[in-house]
């Protein structure tokens, strides 16, 4: 007989946290919680996003992590500026605190920010690019909830498009 942890489904990186939290097991995350809220996004998310959206050839991946999304974007011919708060070994990453430092970038932003700072990432991203450029973030659906987020973000910057993944399929609304 196996322990429950041994039979729990895992995502593409071997982390069972995403499946456990999807099932509502909030306490399950205690043993697999990543420092600095780092959870890598499967690079196939870029493939699916690019089926529906076009982007400027210059992309800023401001929470690059180990470079999974950046590498996939580069494979499509994008020029990718890579920054992160933590050096996770991805070549060419500039160490930047995206939450507190202000930059201007003439391109689009595609990233998977740490959930606990998603509001700050959204606001700073929108402030960092020219009007009319795009910000695409891989976020939990809960990011759309809450009076405070509505007042600070969505009442001023309503999302243009929201894509929802269900069982690894992309649903376009």
Where are these regions (language model features)?
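Class I S-adenosyl-L-methionine-dependent methyltransferase catalytic core
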Residues: 2-173
